[in-house]
Swiss-Prot record:
Name of the coding gene: rpsE
PANTHER family with a match to the protein in the record: MITOCHONDRIAL RIBOSOMAL PROTEIN S5 (PTHR48277:SF1)
Biological processes, Gene Ontology terms: translation
Biological role: With S4 and S12 plays an important role in translational accuracy. Located at the back of the 30S subunit body where it stabilizes the conformation of the head with respect to the body.
Keywords of this entry: Ribonucleoprotein, Ribosomal protein, RNA-binding, rRNA-binding
Domain remark in the UniProt entry: The N-terminal domain interacts with the head of the 30S subunit; the C-terminal domain interacts with the body and contacts protein S4. The interaction surface between S4 and S5 is involved in control of translational fidelity.
Gene Ontology cellular-component terms listed: small ribosomal subunit
Subunit structure: Part of the 30S ribosomal subunit. Contacts proteins S4 and S8.
SUPFAM superfamilies in the cross-refs: dsRNA-binding domain-like (SSF54768), Ribosomal protein S5 domain 2-like (SSF54211)
GO molecular function per UniProt: rRNA binding; structural constituent of ribosome
Species of origin: Acidovorax ebreus (strain TPSY) (Diaphorobacter sp. (strain TPSY))
Protein name: Small ribosomal subunit protein uS5
Family annotation (Pfam families): Ribosomal_S5, Ribosomal_S5_C
Gene3D superfamilies membership: 3.30.160.20, 3.30.230.10
S5 DRBM domain boundaries: 17-80
Amino acid sequence: MAKFQPKVQSEGQDDGLREKMIAVNRVTKVVKGGRILGFAALTVVGDGDGRVGMGKGKSKEVPAAVQKAMEEARRNMVKVSLKNGTIHHNVTGHHGAAVVMMAPAPKGTGIIAGGPMRAVFEVMGITDIVAKSHGSSNPYNMVRATFDALTNSTTPAEVAAKRGKTVEDLFAA
C-alpha cells in the first residue's frame, strides 16, 4: 500500500487541479472486542476557473482517507460561472443549521471568508468575495451550504433566458 500511494498523488498533480484538505477527524467504531480507530477526511478540489468538487473519505490511516476524499472530490465536480474573479450576485446557501451568505466584491478586496469557505473559494479561482457564515460551524455543513449557494447562483444570460428577454433589456430599466 505504501509503495502505491506516491504514484497516485503524482497522478493527481498532473491534471492541474488544486487540492485543499479541510478537516481530518478521528472516528471510533465500538465493537464487542473493543474500539476500532479510523480517520475521516474532508477535501475540496478545483481547477481555478470555476469548477469545484467536495469529497469525503474514511480509512484506518490518514493518507488513505485523504486520498479517497480527493478522488471523490474529483468525481463530484460542479461548474460555477464567475465574473472577473467573483460571483455575479448576492447568494445564500443552507445545509442543516449552517447558513452562508456571499456577496460579490470589487477587484482587490480579496477573499473575506472564514474557515472551510475560504478553501472552497481558493481552489475554484475566486479572488474577490465577501462571505459570512451563521449557525453551525461544522465544516461538513459549511462546505455543503457553500456548494448550495454557488450552484444556485445564476448569470445575467440565464436570468434573461428565463424571462424571455435579452441581457440588455434586463439592465435597461
